[in-house]
Curated annotation (Swiss-Prot):
InterPro entries: Ribosomal_uS10, Ribosomal_uS10_CS, Ribosomal_uS10_dom, Ribosomal_uS10_dom_sf. This is Small ribosomal subunit protein uS10. GO terms for biological process: translation. Gene3D superfamilies: Ribosomal protein S10 domain. Involved in the binding of tRNA to the ribosomes. Signal peptide: none annotated. Keywords: Ribonucleoprotein, Ribosomal protein.
Amino acid sequence: MAAQKIRIRLKAYDHEVIDSSARKIVETVTRTGAQVAGPVPLPTEKNVYCVIRSPHKYKDSREHFEMRTHKRLIDILDPTPKTVDSLMRLDLPAGVDIEIKL
């Protein structure tokens, strides 16, 4: 039988929030006795929106806004039932999107 692996992918707009969440996950996993690989920083996605400043004309005057999406990847190798239970109970901030693949 192949070794089990849980892959957790985190996304957030604030890099400090995502780093603290990744730190919490790694501490929880190591405390329960499973091995962890990561957090691996994935490329930051940058969306730039260009908006005309004036409501009428003056197309030459524009303003740029950007949204940066930071991503992290954590692999949990050989998870125990205690590991899965503690991950389900873990309380993370609302600004972090979590994707879990088994």
